[in-house]
């Protein structure tokens, strides 16, 4: 997707909160915005 591996790592190495859709650090255990612990890793491939 991204042109450079550094940019791809910066864009895709995050966790997404399933309650409020906030972007969180990859090592986060709870959401920085709403406090929920329902986090998922961001998808590495886009769905068509």
Curated annotation (Swiss-Prot):
It comes from the Archaea. Keywords: Ribonucleoprotein, Ribosomal protein. The keyword Ribonucleoprotein applies. InterPro entries: Ribosomal_eL40_arc (IPR023657), Ribosomal_eL40_dom (IPR001975), Ribosomal_eL40_sf (IPR038587), Ribosomal_zn-bd (IPR011332). GO terms for cellular component: ribonucleoprotein complex; ribosome. GO terms for molecular function: structural constituent of ribosome. It comes from Methanoculleus marisnigri (strain ATCC 35101 / DSM 1498 / JR1). This is Large ribosomal subunit protein eL40. One of its GO terms (biological process) is translation. Belongs to the eukaryotic ribosomal protein eL40 family. Transmembrane segments: none annotated. The keyword Lyase does not apply. The lineage of its organism: Archaea, Methanobacteriati, Methanobacteriota, Stenosarchaea group, Methanomicrobia. Gene3D superfamilies: 4.10.1060.50.
